[in-house]
């Protein structure tokens, strides 16, 4: 049991968390330089992985497919501990360097604010059950360098806005459990991000430029 997205809202459901596994596997395969056959982004940015490295799976219609186009087989090794999943692709030593670059487009889409009547809550009580997230459009690149050759791939992703949802009491008194409040902070993401997997190591290097969307308070500054 973990959170799933249903009708635009996060709820607990059977099979929840599969996208976390898919996103982690996609990121590992991406930095290994594997061929991307089929991958779709989430319907909203995720807090557990960088925007642009996430992946969605929904049985049986949406899948994640990567192809090992390396000249050697690989082993998928996964570790789970303290609520953290780590996936490694193990194979022969490679001299390739892989860089992920993400740029957030300047125009973002405003999110809706919805009020949902709740007869279990007393009149006048309001509970924020889902914090809104604006809609983003991003361009992402993968640059693979090996010896004197560099190959660049380019994709575009769109994340629709996530509605902000308030549960609004309409009853005479509290007659049920209070809905869980969404305590997540405002969503921020660096407008420019570059992550490089260095050749032959597990070391990653990051270059960040916050831009308009990477610092707290950006939604107010952007009039959202």
Predicted regions and their residues:
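Well-ordered beta-sheet/strand-loop patches within structured domains
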Residues: 1-224
